[in-house]
C-alpha cells in the first residue's frame, strides 16, 4: 500500500493549524476566577486599546448593548465599554460602574426616598413662606390691632371714636360748637321753662312774649322727655 507522504504532511499541517486557532478562541473567552472576577484576554485588550475595569470582562462577540441600573430600557452603548461587559450578577449603574444587582436596587430606592423627601421639604417651605407673606400683608393693611378695635368699638361709640375711624370733617360744627352731652342732659331733663327755650332757640326781638308770657306748662308738655339731635338742630 502506497501512502503519499506529501498529502499526509499537508493534512497534518492543516490539522495543527485549525487546532491552534481553536485553542486561541478558547483562551479568548472569559473565565471566572477564584474571587468571582473574570480573567480576560490581555492580548486582545492590548490590541484594541480597551481595558476592562473591576467586575467586568472582555467580550469580543458583543451583540447588544448593556442594560443600565436605573432604567432597564435605557441601553448603554458608549464606545469605551463596547467590549467590556459586567460579570454575571452585576449591572452597570448611572456612573457606568458594574455593581451587584441588589446594591443597584437599594441605591435606586434611596434615591427615590431622597427625591420624595426633598419634594416634601420644598412644598412645606413654600407653604410656610406663603403663610408668612399672607400674615405680613394682613398686618400691613390693618392699622388697628384686633384687640384694640374690640376695645374701642365695644358698647357706645362716641364722636371721638368716629373721628378716629372715619376722619374728622373739616369746618365741622363740632369744632366751633362742641356739644356737652352731659350738660345738655342736665339742662333739658324734666320740664322746660321759658328761660331754657330762649337759651336754645334764642329770644325773639319785639316779641309778644314780653307782654304775653308763654304757657310754660304747655311748652313743657311739648318738649318733655329726651330731646334728640334733630330737635336741637
Swiss-Prot record:
Residues 1-28 form the signal peptide. CDD domains: TIL. Keywords: Host-virus interaction, Inhibition of host innate immune response by virus, Signal, Viral immunoevasion. Residues 201-233 are annotated as: Disordered. It comes from the Viruses. Gene3D superfamilies: Laminin. Residues 52-104 form the TIL domain. GO terms for biological process: symbiont-mediated suppression of host innate immune response. Disulfide bonds: none annotated. It holds the Pfam family TIL. SUPFAM superfamilies: Serine protease inhibitors (SSF57567). Counteracts the host humoral immune response by inhibiting the processing and the amidolytic activity of host PAP3. Thereby, melanization of host hemolymph, normally producing several reactive intermediates toxic for viruses, is deregulated and proper immune response cannot occur. Belongs to the polydnaviridae EGF-like motif protein family. Interacts with host PAP1 and PAP3. This is Protease inhibitor Egf1.0. The gene is O12.
Amino acid at each position: 500500500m502506497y501512502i503519499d507522504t506529501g498529502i499526509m504532511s499537508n493534512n497534518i499541517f492543516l490539522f495543527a493549524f485549525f487546532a491552534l486557532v481553536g485553542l486561541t478562541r478558547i483562551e479568548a473567552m472569559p473565565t471566572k476566577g477564584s474571587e468571582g472576577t473574570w480573567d480576560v484576554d490581555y492580548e486582545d485588550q492590548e490590541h484594541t486599546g480597551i481595558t476592562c475595569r473591576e467586575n467586568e470582562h472582555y467580550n469580543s462577540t458583543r451583540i447588544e448593548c448593556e442594560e443600565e441600573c436605573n432604567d432597564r430600557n435605557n441601553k448603554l452603548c458608549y464606545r469605551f465599554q463596547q467590549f467590556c461587559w459586567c460579570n454575571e450578577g452585576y449591572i452597570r449603574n448611572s456612573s457606568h460602574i458594574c455593581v451587584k444587582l441588589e446594591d443597584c436596587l437599594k441605591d435606586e430606592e434611596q434615591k427615590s426616598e431622597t427625591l420624595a423627601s426633598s419634594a416634601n421639604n420644598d412644598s412645606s417651605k413654600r407653604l410656610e413662606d406663603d403663610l408668612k407673606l399672607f400674615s405680613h400683608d394682613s398686618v400691613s393693611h390693618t392699622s388697628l390691632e384686633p384687640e384694640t378695635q374690640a376695645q374701642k368699638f365695644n358698647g357706645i361709640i362716641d364722636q371721638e371714636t368716629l373721628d378716629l375711624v372715619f376722619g374728622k370733617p373739616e369746618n365741622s360744627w363740632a369744632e366751633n360748637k362742641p356739644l356737652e352731652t352731659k350738660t345738655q342732659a342736665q339742662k333739658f331733663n324734666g320740664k322746660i321753662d321759658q328761660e331754657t327755650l330762649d337759651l336754645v332757640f334764642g329770644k325773639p326781638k319785639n316779641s309778644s312774649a314780653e307782654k304775653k308770657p308763654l304757657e310754660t306748662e304747655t311748652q313743657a308738655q311739648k318738649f318733655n322727655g329726651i330731646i334728640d339731635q334733630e330737635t336741637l338742630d
